[in-house]
């Protein structure tokens, strides 16, 4: 039986996205994460990994310098997983690259408070 977006289990789409992301094929990864997101929106977002679909798609957007597209995904991922410091750190990078230094510094400080050491480097370098 062929898989279509309406009957494909979400996890394979997510893991295929991860494979593409690890191969630096960000456009294909974005497409797979987008399908996983579409499926989750249709069938419920209570599955524990849904935040990661948004986080990973946002990370891919960040890698291809489509930072303005990454910010809403990082923000939604934080809605689903509000104590994830890595999401704050990466959204901070996206904010900084889009000229929103105040928001970037706020996110980096939050990430630092959640144990992300690299965020402290950003705070020291860019938030004086």
Predicted stretch roles:
Residues 1-128:
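Alpha-helical tetratricopeptide repeat
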